[in-house]
UniProtKB/Swiss-Prot annotation:
It is found in: Nucleus. Residues 125-188 are annotated as: NELF-C/D-binding. GO terms for biological process: negative regulation of transcription elongation by RNA polymerase II; positive regulation of transcription by RNA polymerase II. This is Negative elongation factor A. Keywords: Nucleus, Phosphoprotein, Repressor, Transcription, Transcription regulation. Essential component of the NELF complex, a complex that negatively regulates the elongation of transcription by RNA polymerase II. The NELF complex, which acts via an association with the DSIF complex and causes transcriptional pausing, is counteracted by the P-TEFb kinase complex. The modification Phosphoserine is found at S225, S233, S363. Residues 225-238 have a biased composition (Polar residues). PANTHER family: NEGATIVE ELONGATION FACTOR A, NEGATIVE ELONGATION FACTOR A NELF-A. Its main location: nucleus. The HDAg-like domain is essential for transcriptional repression, and mediates the interaction with the RNA polymerase II complex. The NELF complex is composed of NELFA, NELFB, NELFCD and NELFE; NELFA and NELFCD form a stable subcomplex that binds to the N-terminus of NELFB. In vitro, the NELFA:NELFCD subcomplex binds to ssDNA and ssRNA in a sequence- and structure-dependent manner. Interacts with the RNA polymerase II complex when it is not phosphorylated by P-TEFb. Interacts with NELFB. The keyword NAD does not apply.
């Protein structure tokens, strides 16, 4: 723009400001009047048209004060050139803007003896006198309210109404609306009053037609009485024969059915519904047995749950599981286990840890939830104890020294706490127990991978973590172990050649004497497990 020639500047100004439909300079001109443009305008101002000169002079009023101060000399030169112009309007606007670059105010002290101003005012008075005086309002009328405008300009004459639309009164409109609403309501009542029933349940509103015979009952087969003879039925058994039905014909009207026929019609539907209900129960039953509810707790951990869940848990008896085992020093922790190619001689197999099926007397006393799973592996108990042969006497687990465990005799000492432990647990009063946020997260993480722990065992673990120190099996000692999960792992051998598949049991150990709990792993070789 700085290198623009004078002719280019003049053509550019004519394109921007040469429109005759708008005689005022728009505010957007302020962004176009830069310092370079003002310098070029000063050189080509005398060649511009009168309309462009007027808009350019009026556009300087939109410039910011900082821009006016920067371009004061150029603006004063342009205004000085405008005072020498031949157009009277350009001369008058230049006289008004004479003091604007210096003081920022307009020069309104125009001399009355100035012939140019006198000529322009005379032309304006002639133009105003030609117009009707009542239509002329001051420029500030749009900023004044009615009272202030009346005080300034006097009473305003109302506009003359040359014609007026003929409209119905409001009462007539309301009367027509009420009449239409009453007509619609009467039609709806008349339509609903003639419908005594739905024909065949099709949803069609029809009136009862009493002139035509009913098509549901054929004329050729009337109702038979007990005295009417029948060729196809024995004489001693005379019952009314239901009317024959034509399934392909669309029946209308009222159909009379015998009670026996109603039973036969609904029997198939009832049988189908009952069969569907049985199928859904069969599908849902195994899923319910496999699902372990982790949120429910028994009575001795009732403080861990909300009062809404407590009502459903009070009716369930709390029994210790068969996997409570006293701690023994023969447990190998997960961190200290060194796998070797030799087979350990001590641990029995999983088949040997199951209770024998020969003594059938103690099995009816056990709950069903403990019959379905085998007791946890315990390497510390002696499986050769012959004492549990009598089912009536309570058994006490003993560990005699110098006895080598064998895989043929199963350990049955796990069944001993089942006969006498539940009674004192149910009689003890409830305590308000609560878990911290960290304990809740730890329990959730622990139960997420637990595939062997039962619902009572989970409740016992949560109660111990919350602060319960009531030992459900005092006969087994202060330390109780609960089997959480069971899985297999491939561990490398000690010599580094190959790997051995081990059966890993994750065990949760609770010490009721110290209040501490730990979690560790037990390893068993897969060669001993069939």
């Amino acid at each position: 723009m700085a290198s623009m020639r004078e002719s280019d500047t003049g053509l550019w100004l004519h394109n921007k400001l040469g429109a005759t439909d708008e005689l005022w300079a728009p505010p957007s001109i302020a962004s176009l009047l830069t310092a370079a443009v003002i310098d070029n305008i000063r050189l080509c101002f005398h060649r511009l048209s009168s309309a462009v000169k007027l808009k350019l002079l009026l556009g300087t009023l939109h410039l910011p004060r900082r821009t006016v101060d920067e371009m004061k000399a150029a603006l004063m030169d342009i205004i000085q050139l405008a005072t020498l112009d031949s157009d009277p309007w350009v001369l008058m606007v230049a006289d008004i803007l004479k003091s604007f670059p210096d003081t920022g105010s307009l020069n309104l002290d125009l001399e009355e003896q100035n012939p140019n101003v006198q000529d322009i005012l005379g032309e304006l008075r002639e133009k105003v006198s030609e117009c009707e005086a009542s239509a002329m309002l001051p420029l500030e009328c749009q900023y004044l309210n009615k009272n202030a405008l009346t005080t300034l300009a006097g009473p305003l004459t109302p506009p003359v109404k040359h014609f007026q639309l003929k409209r119905k009164p409001k009462s007539a409109t309301l009367r027509a609306e009420l009449l239409q609403k009453s007509t619609e309501t009467a039609q709806q009542l008349k339509r609903s009053a003639g419908v005594p029933f739905h024909a065949k349940g099709r949803g069609l509103l029809r009136k009862m037609d009493t002139t035509t015979p009913l098509k549901g009952i054929p004329k050729q087969a009337p109702f038979r009485s007990p005295t009417t003879p029948s060729v196809f039925s024995p004489s001693g058994n005379r019952t009314p024969i239901p009317p024959s039905r034509t399934p392909l014909q669309k029946e209308r009207g009222v159909k009379l059915l015998d009670i026996s026929e109603l039973n036969t019609v609904g029997a198939g539907r009832e049988a189908k519904r009952r069969r569907k209900t049985l199928d859904t129960e069969v599908v849902e039953k195994p899923t319910k047995e496999e699902t372990v509810v982790e949120n429910a707790t028994p009575d001795y951990a009732a403080g861990l749950v909300s009062t809404q869940k407590l009502g459903s848990l009070n009716s369930e008896p709390t029994l210790p599981s068969t996997s409570y085992l006293p701690s023994t020093p023969s447990v190998v922790p997960a961190s200290s286990y060194i796998p070797s190619s030799e087979t350990p001689p001590a641990p029995p197999s999983r088949e040997a840890s199951r209770p024998p099926e020969e003594p059938s007397a103690p099995s009816p006393t056990l709950p069903t939830q403990f019959k379905q799973r085998a007791p946890m592996y315990n390497s510390g108990l002696s499986p050769a104890t012959p004492a549990p042969a009598a089912p009536t006497s309570p058994l006490t687990p003993t560990t005699p020294p110098a006895v080598t465990p064998t895989a043929q005799t199963p350990p049955v000492a796990m069944v001993a706490p089942q006969t006498q432990a539940p009674a004192p647990v149910q009689q003890q009063p409830k305590k308000n127990l609560s878990l911290t946020r960290e304990q809740m997260f730890a329990a959730q993480e622990m139960f997420k991978t637990a595939n062997k722990v039962t619902r009572p065992e989970k409740a016992l673990i949560l109660g111990f973590m919350a602060g319960s120190r009531e030992n459900p099996c005092p006969e087994q000692g202060d330390v109780i172990q609960i089997k959480l999960s069971e899985h297999t792992e491939d561990l490398p051998k000690a010599d580094g050649q190959g790997s051995t598949t081990m059966l890993v049991d994750t065990v949760f150990e609770m010490n009721y004497a110290t209040g501490q709990w730990t979690r560790f792993k037990k390893y068993k070789p897969m060669t001993n497990v069939s």
